[in-house]
UniProtKB/Swiss-Prot annotation:
One of its GO terms (cellular component) is anaphase-promoting complex. The gene is ANAPC10. Belongs to the APC10 family. It comes from the Eukaryota. The modification N-acetylthreonine is found at residue 2. One of its GO terms (biological process) is protein K11-linked ubiquitination. This is Anaphase-promoting complex subunit 10. SMART domains: APC10 (SM01337). The modification N6-acetyllysine is found at residue 169. Residues 2-185 form the DOC domain.
Amino acid sequence: MTTPNKTPPGADPKQLERTGTVREIGSQAVWSLSSCKPGFGVDQLRDDNLETYWQSDGSQPHLVNLQFRRKTTVKTLCIYADYKSDESYTPSKISVRVGNNFHNLQEIRQLELVEPSGWIHVPLTDNHKKPTRTFMIQIAVLANHQNGRDTHMRQIKIYTPVEESSIGKFPRCTTIDFMMYRSIR
């Protein structure tokens, strides 16, 4: 059982992107849900609007599945939850699982949330801080606050590390002789 990374209240994951070390790859995945109320599905989970949300419609666990076309390196999962707005719909226990498909998923994180308000940053790294490589991620809501039945999640973002290109590793041309040949005419 782990607790998510401590981040300042409301820490926007877009700040991670601005550092240039990660990029959001949710658009590369095929998203599916275990259930949803009409008008409260994947589109609302991915629309960058903190006022909209996915609402499940059925028994627990409530599942969000992300499937990638090829094995993908993932570093951080960000979930937006708001206890003040959602009360008993707010997740209190979440399991994050990865694998090649539905049949071999393995839990890599289990989170206990206490009245969350804002972005929850979940590292998807091993003990050596190495990012996970996977075809599939499953986020399972195992319990809600106040024993609520259905759940609300307002946003989910998934990040991969940005790899340095070899072009940036070449030394700069600093002498006049080198500068004459730095571009093609």
